[in-house]
Curated annotation (Swiss-Prot):
InterPro entries: Dihydro-acid_dehy_C, DihydroxyA_deHydtase, DiOHA_6PGluconate_deHydtase_CS, ILV_EDD_C, ILV_EDD_N, IlvD/EDD_N. GO terms for molecular function: 2 iron, 2 sulfur cluster binding; dihydroxy-acid dehydratase activity; magnesium ion binding. Belongs to the IlvD/Edd family. The keyword Coiled coil does not apply. Pfam families: ILV_EDD_C, ILVD_EDD_N. Mg(2+) binds at residues 81, 123-124, 491. It comes from Pectobacterium atrosepticum (strain SCRI 1043 / ATCC BAA-672) (Erwinia carotovora subsp. atroseptica). Homodimer. Keywords: 2Fe-2S, Amino-acid biosynthesis, Branched-chain amino acid biosynthesis, Iron, Iron-sulfur, Lyase, Magnesium, Metal-binding. This is Dihydroxy-acid dehydratase. Binds 1 [2Fe-2S] cluster per subunit. This cluster acts as a Lewis acid cofactor. The lineage of its organism: Bacteria, Pseudomonadati, Pseudomonadota, Gammaproteobacteria, Enterobacterales. It catalyses: (2R)-2,3-dihydroxy-3-methylbutanoate = 3-methyl-2-oxobutanoate + H2O; (2R,3R)-2,3-dihydroxy-3-methylpentanoate = (S)-3-methyl-2-oxopentanoate + H2O.
Amino acid sequence: MPKYRSATTTHGRNMAGARALWRATGMTDDDFGKPIIAVVNSFTQFVPGHVHLRDLGKLVAEQIEASGGVAKEFNTIAVDDGIAMGHGGMLYSLPSRELIADSVEYMVNAHCADAMVCISNCDKITPGMLMASLRLNIPVIFVSGGPMEAGKTKLSNQIIKLDLIDAMIQGANPNVSDADSEQIERSACPTCGSCSGMFTANSMNCLTEALGLSQPANGSLLATHADRRDLFLNAGTRIVGLAKRYYEQDDASVLPRNIANKAAFENAMILDIAMGGSTNTVLHLLAAAQEGEIDFTMSDIDRLSRKVPHLCKVAPSGQKYHMEDVHRAGGVIGILGELDRAGLLNREVNNVLGKTLPETLEAYDVMLTKDESVKRMYSAGPAGIRTTKAFSQDCRWDSLDTDRQEGCIRSREYAYSQDGGLAVLYGNIAVDGCIVKTAGVDKESLIFRGPAKVYESQDDAVEAILGGKVVAGDVVVIRYEGPKGGPGMQEMLYPTTYLKSMGLGKSCALITDGRFSGGTSGLSIGHASPEAASGGIIGLVQDGDMIAIDIPSRSIVLDVAENELASRRETELARGDAAWTPHNRERQVSFALRAYAILATSADKGAVRDKSKLGG
């Protein structure tokens, strides 16, 4: 029978000092022996996805206490990728994932907590907490802050849906008036919550459902809706039950590594491909798998991407649907239901509800359930009122979207495409693979060939795009922006956005060893591995080199002879200590980022730390 971890600090005369300090936090004799649950919050006023979380930790804590546990809350940092975008702040985004994972480990292990409720939401916070959960392997439930309502505005006498990406595109479009640009900007992000499309934050929150570590509707129920309160209350109750099952009944099935096992990781990736999730999810799933010592690699992602159809097309891949529409159609469970009926899921998996996948689908799939309370939950809709407060409205759709032919979520028979929303490409420019969000690529661009325009920083690429130096047919190559070379693997949202602003979104390709925002669409290929700073061939590309991209064949090739590449490599190595660094780039890099770069691996490994350098 496993012993409560917290007993280390609450039992025995030698722990009198620790108990004295626990008493100073409000604990009493009756509390010693109860499970101590860490409530891991990520409230901050910097991030709209987290601005409403201040009191939600208390909500969970009160429910934990009422259910027989002891709740202790602490906070992690949270970086807003949208605000950090387009300047030096973006260098800190991906490294913050490791800091979040470490800070959770530090707090939980230092104080011997028995279990966790992780209150996450945005881009690096959910992945960081997920990495920590699998590293620590103690009972955990994720409950996110929820998605933002989609923005809406009236242009040309027509009501249109908006999100952050629309504001960015139109803000840089010289053909859009100042008045229209300002109207879009003011309307794009109307409420608290994670940005309203299938961007990285919402993608990751959806994947926690497929991994079995969060409750149904976690990924899709709006941040503003009153129904979301129940997710927090239920998380507080359920985590005490999970802790007692493990520590008092020796039931290891409730541990995250046994719930989020390889079969669950495959299901999460299948969901991601089917819903055209952010390419960043690949990076984060690979990282989380390594933390959990789960054998899940790029090869698995490549294998799965070849058989999974695209069942749910959401912004930024199209503007008709946002997360509020996914929820109306049944949310993540609705997509999983269609994937299950297509025979694509591993069914022998469990979740924090204590249910198998078939049991969960029977109870929560809107196409199967007879439970009116479940249908009511999925009818939760937007209010269209600007607010930063959670649970502030109770609006309902008049009906659910159960149209699996032409609705938001499709059956396999009526899929948006039989080829899924993400693909892994291989070739000499990315020997270890690279990622493209096929959900956002026009059919006419699936096969593309063009001359390279090479830039060694995002800033130089943006200047060239806005300056008219990039023309239709070009392949923009941005290198030395990987985990080690950036350092920090910046998102290339501004270059892809400005290509659209300049009318080049469908006539150019972009390849980088950096990564993309979940808001990116178009022929945007990221995570090229090995990265330039690790000696990858992307570091040898020259202006004018022809690059051939064939997504159906999963290939990407730099059309340069092997002997010429060998000659270029010798020239690069002759630079000595300067080899595999930018030839002409001025960038201030802090010691914190340099420390990150020393241990960073390329994207095909999830950009995690190189354990071999630490003796691991």
